[in-house]
């Protein structure tokens, strides 16, 4: 095996460096709202939200969730900005008739939820066991199982590629169409077993804070995550797009190199969500690093 001029740290070193780096979201907030504070939440458009974001959320509420929110008039330029924003989040089909861009993929292009998996081996084995045994249980609920898979898939997308609204909208769409068939007691138990309760609460909180859902529509959470609104707006202002091949290490002569910008972007994303799913974030971190260096020619 050729020696190289670049020393690759072990996966353990990478993980320890990652875990030792402080981040404002790695510690739980000092105060959480009580459920009673959120039972009457309506569409919460903050005073600092610009017209493009307001129309983004209102069009989704009207086209996906059957609401009747008023759409504000905008210039052709702003409609094009909105359409490109929707395209970035995989929701272009709902905005194409309002701007000069072709219809692009939306919810129907998301992979089937049954293909979801977790990077942590123990948690993934638990997910497989749930998926295998649930259809044969006495109180079997396939709708609950499907919804769990949607949450797992959404979580994996957020951790790997950043927050994209196509997945958040899919959660809301399933709740509105099949929410009455979901066994929420069973779902809560599964989320706890998979250590996904906090990040599932974050995903549901984004529905409440931006898309007009009420707390009582989402029985598997008891309060709204305070940071949900800011994280949702950040995803619109500065969407993260991380492609798998951006993270690959390349062996060029005697040197090994990689896309450091993509690596920093990925680790910032991991740190942002570490508090909400620490075990899965750590496993994703190690998995991505090991998968990237495995492509180096020995």
Language-model segments: residues:
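Conserved NTP-donor binding/palm subdomain of two-metal-ion nucleotidyltransferases/polymerases, i.e.
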Residues: 15, 46-298
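Compositionally biased, intrinsically disordered low-complexity segments enriched in Pro/Arg/Gln/His
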Residues: 14-15, 22-25, 29-39, 44-46
